[in-house]
Amino acid sequence: MIKIVGGIALGVALLVLALPTIVHKAGLHPEYNGEAVQLPAGKRALIIATNQAVLSAPGETTGDATGVMASEMTHPYYRFLDAGMQVDLASIKGGKIPVDPQTINRLLKTPEDDRFLADPAFLAKVENSMRIDDVDFTQHDIIFMAGGFGAAYDLGYSPVLAEKISEAYYASNEPVIGGVCHGVLGLINAKDRDGKSLIAGRRMTGVTDKQIKELGIIEITPQHPETELRKAGVIFESNTRIMDFLATLVVVDDEERFVTGQNQNSGRETAHRMLELVASKST
């Protein structure tokens, strides 16, 4: 009997140890190894993230800890940095960007997350991010909006962010604009010069309503990317799996100005596709 119990315990322990590998092979945080991009000196990227630290239901102020999903910030950060870019970090209010603690646990943590946790310069940027009001978006070649549940509370509600996205779109340097998962909510209120939706009629993606339901936050978070993008007139595209948490898709709009990723699995490819577009304009 003791041997049987011991065998079961060992099997459970081995399963727990293997879980990160299992979910990775199932589709979580897939590798993306496109052709290496190295940009000329002087190129700048701006990553925008949330200040929201509490997953609170409507009318409430308390709830579980939340924030940016680590990989949705770290994957693009290191892709841009390693391509030779200066990478700035901003948020709606400035100051600390909360990192959702669940997203740096053993099951979800990625090599880029480990690199971040040992990177004093990056950690300092997260603790003291720039306020978007104080950032000139037109001085950047890439503007990337990270997601995470926290972004559902502030990115889509910021008139300053919407205005600055519009300004960047019309800037002479034509920056590439994008984001992943809930980060795309930062695009929904951007306007063109006629006061109409800047993103209407464009092909885009973001986290699906299906995934939000599967994660159990459909009745908690105030905005849902698929719903809001469709309201803004976007031609919404997505992939689906038995669980959308394991799906991924990256969409480049026909004008090649916007690059959007479906969810946390899309950060590496989204960042790489943005780099490719910047590189194509630099030659």
Locate predicted features.
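Conserved, well-structured core segments that form or line functional sites
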Residues: 177
